[in-house]
Amino acid sequence: MSNRESGVLMHISSLPGNYGIGSFGKSAYDFVDFLVRTKQTYWQILPLGTTSYGDSPYQSFSAFAGNTNFIDFDILIEEGLINKEDVLTNWGEDETTVDYALLYEKRRPVLEKAVAAFLAKGKTPAYEKFVEEKAEWLEPFAEYMAIKESFDMKPWTAWSDEAIKRRQPDALAEYRTRLADKLEYHRVTQFFFDEQWHALKKYANDNFIQIIGDMPIYVAADSVEMWATPHYFKTDEEGNPLCVAGCPADDFSPLGQLWGNPIYNWEAMKEDGYTWWSKRLQASFELFDVVRIDHFRGFSAYWEIPASAENATIGKWVKGPGYDLFKAVKEQLGELPIIAEDLGFMDEDVINLREATGFPGMKILEFGFMGENPKSGDLPHHYPVNAVAYTGTHDNDTVLGWYKSATEETREFCNRYLNRRDEEPISFALLRGLFGSVSRMTVATMQDLLQLDETARMNIPSTLGGNWVWRMTEEQLTESVEEFLLGITELYDRANPHHNVDVKEELVEEEK
């Protein structure tokens, strides 16, 4: 990240397409082309992990496995694993949202047919290599999902068989034999995910676009990690979390945020040389060029809440592993291309940790206008060079939604700060201010480029339902959007030097 650069935040699920959710298919390749035409350097996405209840990519059944919802059906058709007739069904009434319940019902039979066709042809060398190389996480994941399905998708602590809850060898061998077909299904679909994702990433990298991935700091209570490696977490004898993660109360959340994720047993991880973290980050760097770590402050100190608590007001700050973790991982992996999500309550220890690692932190422009205070560190004239600047994150409202709900004083301060003209869309005004900052890297949220309101918001923290569903349509990505993004990218010296494309000339050629 040595030069001034920019990118776009757009999750895979939000891409347009024919099958109810964005995928690794044509629309993803088209999006790379859009980034090239607008001279971007980065495509930032949310976590790619398999989602569980609530559909959040930050609550996954595995810290390593991929989300099979993103497997593209058209690619499977091209490979002869399914037919077009297999996907001729209603994938949702509204192309601007994801219907996860519908996907859960309809995707599995299609993927099962593809898996059967794949296995009927004989296991390929590429598949056998994948299974061998990824066995350390792939086998426990396949076991967990197959057994979980046999118990009606209940979390492992609710399984009625005590022997398999505790992974006793005889019980595990019996389930592996009985559920052999289900285990193979999960191995093969993870292979499909891996093949399609790496083909897409190669296309992006070949076109000088780097992928910024996202890694949640915590794992879910209902996850293979809790089942297979409980010693890495603070649990009781039954495997239930003794305490969970969250955030204390603040002006935005009077009761705090109760995430419910189990807390790590950092002493056990330290005794193991933080090997689990090295493996997790290594797996992430195989998927992404840069990794954003969510809730970075949790490595300095984290808010620990009793598992029985009804909200996050009852808790305490507990010291985290600090620099020792990153020192150990760096010794094992080398340089770490990481972005530290350092938002929220920041004290001197967190700042010192971020500076010790050298990781760039984050700045959120929407925060800068709250309180109408020119001294706010989230206003561009205070940004450090070593930072990644955003209008907002997946947890923020879109710029238009935020502006509509802001006070008259905040709107007036915002307009005056940005020297905004009446006819200038507020989303474009904030993006203009963002790209003009001294921060080495800026990331535009796709919804803001499209000037969308609160209905396109990705997530409202501490709420269930209606989150993670927004999708873009092909018609929304217009020539004027491209021209605006290209314009501010070039004007503020963020253009990718490898992309010497005149978007206007290319559009004229396409029309011919």
Tell me the role of every PLM-derived stretch.
Residues 36, 197-205, 330, 354-355:
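Surface-exposed amphipathic alpha-helices with a cationic face
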Residues 26-51, 287-288:
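Catalytic domains of carbohydrate-active enzymes, especially glycoside hydrolases
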Residues 2, 11, 55-190, 219-443, ...:
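Alpha-amylase-like alpha-glycosidases and glucanotransferases acting on alpha-linked glucans and related
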Residues 451-510:
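Structured C-terminal cap/extension of enzyme domains
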Residues 1-13, 29:
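N-terminal regions that are enriched for targeting/export leaders
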Residues 186, 190-219:
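Conserved, well-ordered alpha-helix/loop/beta-strand core segments that scaffold catalytic motifs
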Residues 26-33, 195-203, 277-279, 426-430:
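Short alpha-helical segments and helix-capping/turn motifs at coil-helix boundaries
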